Amino acid sequence: MQRQTTRIISNKNIAAGIFDLTVEWRSAEIALPGQFVNIYLKNPAKLLPRPISICDFDGKQLRMIYRSTGAGSGTDELSGYGEGDEIDITAPVGRGYPIEEIKGQAVGGDIVLMGGGIGIPPMYYLAKKL
């Protein structure tokens, strides 16, 4: 885990208040399903980073889907950033899911993943790795 400055590749509004953010990955570290990214905003009044779950990772790009929580919020500020903007992130954060353990507990090879709301995006990356 390290703090780094990265470039936004895209930050698209995909549904009411929901955004799909993709950033460059400039580290040799591998992001695992279940880990997250701390995003530091440019506004010095917002000191705490915004933790956003990783939705996908291909070794060169990190993809996150997040909800803007309303006017004046940190995620509202983040939703205004666009392609080419630079942001500071700390990533990957957290332990991630125990993929091999999950595979070992599969009954008949089937695994059911459950999530709700903004908890669904991290399931996408987990499903790809299972």
Q: Language-model segments: which ranges?
A:
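Ferredoxin-reductase
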Residues: Q2-E83
